[in-house]
Amino acid sequence: MDCEDFLAKEQKVLELYFLSLGHFNYDKAKETVEKERDALCKTGANYLFSSVLTALSQMAIAEKLYMSLQYLAPKSFLRKDTSLKSLYEALRLEFLRLKDQASCSTPVSCSPSPSSCSPMMTPSPSAMSLSSMSPTVVIGSFHSGTSYMSQSPQAPVLDAFLSHLCGQLHSFVVARARSVDFYDKLYTLSLGKMMKFKDLSATLSDIIQQNQKLFHHPILTPLKSSFSMELEALHHLLEAQVLLSQWQFLQALLHLKEAHARLGEWNASLLLPENRRTPSSLLRADRLPQLVTWINKLNAFMIGKFTLYFYKILSRQATQQEMKTFGSKMTIDYCQRIASLCKKSDALCVQLLFEALGVEGYYEHGYCHPDHVVEAPKGIDSYPVIYSYPTIYQDKQHRPNIIMIITKKSDDLNSEGIVYFYDSRMEKSYFLVKLDPRVTMVAIYVSRKSERDTYIVSCMQDLAAHVRGNKIFGMLKPGNK
């Protein structure tokens, strides 16, 4: 077999491998390259290629572990599992070494030694436990030997291809390692106070921009597409969260639509091209990779939050029954939860107030044409009610009290605690909690309530944790609900 035929044959193997990775079929991808590697080792056809295949086998393990999110689960008490980062670092070094080795222009004709196909590195227990993957699959070591094809005038074509491919795979595993750090940061921040989504979105945007023109070889298209759709969908959702917290209707809606489009493409990539038109071939949710499942849940969470924050605007386009039906289909129906809190605790009303002071482009009714000049709100109108239950409750008599509490108790509210205030003159009790830096939820009662009322406090804390995003980002860790 001459070099050209060999390269054509191995390209088909690589195409199948990367297609399997793109469809999240990691076991098949690993099996494909291991089978070909073993065949090359037996015939001594090309050792350099077999070393690349060994590294790709290890990469399939890393990719499966990455998509499972198992690396976010602690390895032991107060000890992080760093096995995936170690695996990507080993792959980074190996692809860099193979790239440099393939670039060498002084081939030596010899047969690979018996140790050429022997293991040098064993994957971590957490990586091994994910599947039936072999526990001794490793990254191989390249000696200075090459195959008989090195004597062919066409051998430099093969070496150039391998050098280029390994260089691009090196860029890919570096990008993956940054993504691992990003998800780890997302989960860690979910355990604390109000998350800084603007900073997180900027970090993710930087990862996307830096890798936009990297690992672009046609054979890597399935890998590149999956990488791009994953991070772009997540970035649009984070941007939507930032805009929701600023009560920007149109911009938030556009980012949600973009996220929906990316997720549609990514979910479709779970199916092989020939099966995409067959409804019965759709994968069940319990068979989706954990990361895919989580980002779909995040999308549902953002739609629910968008519906809550812009309920007044959306309800003008639908009947009350249609809004109820739409809400019942959501993963979390925030409006129904607020209604339940109001009814069970006998509240006069539960409202969400937005602090519009200093917000550029603020407009109470959704979209505003750029040429339309809108006066900045003043007085109590600078704290508009963006949601109220009962929806017909429009009394402004409590607004001055609420604004005073928000202003005087800002430190307590920003610490994410429940703030209680009783107005003895009006005989009204107020419970307040921050949902976003500019959004406060308040429950108003017509009698004196205990500030430690278990039901009211627990319900408001749970609602706040969900709406802020701490709950959904905490679900990054497998097993968290």
What feature does the model see in each segment?
Residues M1-K481:
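Intrinsically disordered, Ser/Thr-rich regulatory regions of eukaryotic membrane-trafficking proteins
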